[in-house]
Regions:
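Polyanion-binding surfaces on beta-sheet-dominated domains and ring/shell assemblies
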Residues: 1-120
């Protein structure tokens, strides 16, 4: 991870300690931080439901920064509720909302350069 670039991005988007969660192996920007970045860059996101079932959902997000409307990014978010984390990746029954949240986060992080630095 390029620490200098990461510090530069934190300052650019005015991220505070409560906007970031440091996991043992990686850094996670909280929902509050994601929305702060989205607002600052004026990122527009539309969603397409690819699959939505009782315990599984996939959303496709199309996103762009308003100052660069020709650069459209497409990415996905998914959530699977299973018996445990070995079989799934979500511990709640609101899998559609989790898939949407994951698609949103991934799109914002990719458009702003965080994702390539290992921030999720």
């Amino acid at each position: 991870m390029n620490r200098e670039k990461l510090v530069e991005l934190y300052k650019k988007y005015d991220l505070q300690k409560d906007d970031v969660y440091k996991h043992q192996h990686y850094v996670i920007i909280t929902r509050q931080g994601i929305e702060k970045i989205q607002a600052k860059e004026n990122i527009t996101i539309t969603y397409e439901v690819v699959k939505c079932e009782t315990n599984f959902a996939v959303f496709k997000a199309k996103a762009f920064i308003s100052s660069k409307p020709d650069t459209v990014l497409e990415t996905f978010g998914s959530a699977l509720k299973a018996a445990n984390y070995k079989d799934g990746n979500c511990n709640s029954w609101y899998v559609a909302e989790m898939a949407e949240k994951r698609a949103l986060s991934r799109a914002v992080l990719k458009l702003t350069g965080f994702y390539e630095l290992g921030v999720f």
